[in-house]
UniProtKB/Swiss-Prot annotation:
This is Peptide deformylase-like. Pfam families: Pep_deformylase. Gene3D superfamilies: Peptide deformylase. GO terms for molecular function: peptide deformylase activity. Belongs to the polypeptide deformylase family. GO terms for biological process: co-translational protein modification; translation. The active site is at E134. The lineage of its organism: Bacteria, Pseudomonadati, Pseudomonadota, Alphaproteobacteria, Hyphomicrobiales.
Length: 164
């Protein structure tokens, strides 16, 4: 297990769609372990392989350390309810800034586990927000793109100030 270097905004790799995982082997398990260590060190509650510069559709979430991490390979949203919720979001690739983003309140997800077995999961609240946020990242949509232009520009200025 290794803490990897996190790609920082505005690195263009954060806006590129990730490639599907096709090989389910020890290398994938090592990647998932490294993502978990990196996310915990950041600290954060979610991370994707593109956050460490690897173009693979891998997500690790850990909303509650006691419950342990969840690993999603090739996740996709197959259903979303009409109702929307707003929640504070941020990124390990843009530390120190957050803003409110609107997302579906409830979704159904299809993904594979580390052995390649297909799984489905329904989520709501914060977990649904995290699923949508990280799948956006896998699709090359960095979370600030979900903000209005004015809010995005203000947030980027705040982030740039923090980086000085």
């Amino acid at each position: 297990m290794t803490v990897r270097l996190i790609v920082k905004y505005p690195d263009p790799r954060l806006r590129a769609a990730a490639e599907p995982v096709t090989t389910f082997d020890e290398g994938l398990r090592k990647l998932a372990d490294d993502l978990l260590d990196t996310m915990r060190a950041a600290p954060g509650i979610g991370i994707t392989a593109p956050h460490i510069g690897i173009s693979k559709r891998v997500v690790v979430l850990e909303l509650d350390r006691a419950a342990g991490p969840k690993i999603y390979i090739n996740p996709e949203i197959v259903w979303a309810c009409e109702e929307k919720i707003r929640h504070q979001e941020g990124s390990v690739s843009m530390p120190g800034v957050v803003d409110e983003v609107e997302r579906h309140a409830r979704i159904r997800l299809r993904y594979q586990d580390l052995d390649g077995n297909e799984q489905t999961e329904e989520s709501d609240g914060l977990l649904a927000v995290c699923h949508q946020h990280e799948i956006d990242q896998l699709d090359g949509i960095f979370w600030v793109q979900r903000l209005s232009r004015l809010r995005r520009e203000r947030l980027i200025k705040r982030y740039e100030k923090l980086q000085r």
